[in-house]
Amino acid sequence: MSDLFHEAVPLTFIMMVFEVMNLTPQHTYQVLTKRADRLAEVAKHLDWTPNIWMGVSVEDKRVLHRIDGLRGTPAHVKFLSCEPLIGPLPGMDLRGIDWVIVGGESGRKPRPMQEAWVLDIKRQCELFGVDFFFKQWGGTNKKKAGRVLEGRTWDAMPVVA
């Protein structure tokens, strides 16, 4: 996986990628970045058709500032990917955010995710009217760990006409 908004990616290339996405409205593109500052810097140069969903990774409170960079874009759907969630995210400002995805880390040496962190994010989404999607608990065997939270799965997504 790569990051379209990496500093080494020229604006002209980003504009070409957006042009392709603009020309294919039958597809929904979920673009995810960790570089919210660069996103905020170049967003005004891009054509944001409704099929381009923009998101930022927010894995712990050290990077909560990324939400502000996302919020300032003209994307029609704005989302947070809190995966892997490696710490609590208290007091998020979810104004202008449409969707939050939460998941634990998987692989050989995953850092544990606390249920309390997930429940707090879910509560914050409810307060702000934001769709909440719980992807997985993570771990060395993510299928075995599953994706059930409070006795059910959480699959809310924005509906775009």
Regions found by a protein language model. Give the residues of each.
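Auxiliary Fe-S-binding modules of radical SAM enzymes
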Residues: 86, 90-161
